[in-house]
From Swiss-Prot:
Catalytic function, reaction form: dTMP + ATP = dTDP + ADP
Coiled-coil residues: none
GO BP, sorted A to Z: dTDP biosynthetic process; dTTP biosynthetic process; dUDP biosynthetic process
EC code: 2.7.4.9
Source organism of the structure: Chlamydia felis (strain Fe/C-56) (Chlamydophila felis)
Protein known as: Thymidylate kinase
One protein family per Pfam: Thymidylate_kin
Keyword hit for Hydrolase: no
Domain of life: Bacteria
Binding of ATP, residues: 7-14
Amino acid sequence: MFIVIEGCEGSGKSSLTELLKNRLITEGKSVIATREPGGSPLGEQVRNWILNPSLPGISPYTELFLFLASRAQHITEKIIPALESGKIVICDRFHDSTIVYQGIAEGLGKEYVTNLCHHVVGEKKFLPDLTCLLDIPVDTGIKRKQQQKSLDKFEDKPLVYHNKIREGFLSLAEANPENYLILDGRQPLEASLNKVMTAYTELALCK
């Protein structure tokens, strides 16, 4: 099973990813947790380069295709082999982050970016089984990030940009309710974890 954790900056994605991995392992499941951008040696290099606020700016199209190149490698090198071996894969960000950040907030076009993402490794769409969206008010999420570390180039964008991100995620979730679980990022992560586990159990019974 392939589970993706999505959300705005400071929503708790990385923490929920780790909690979910640990809970599934305690239940005897074979699990890997990964992230985007990243997840492979190539992907981590792309991540370090793109997110570095001190590097010269690159065009949104260049960013888009770097993210897609990283994802294609990540899917073929790590995600597909893990799924084929029977592991559960949990990924911190995936297609929808690219659709929302590059397609909507950067203005490259939602449909254009969606098509590129869904077919990044071939004609057949490569999609998660479940996407969990941690929704949180933009100002709350950014304040959390500011308390944790210095901001990267995307985190440091103006609030109007982050509001586009939040609205974009919610629009994707509302358009695909059968594949999305919306979680309140202001609530304790343990509460969100329990909801994800319920959704996971229901999905596993259907497979």
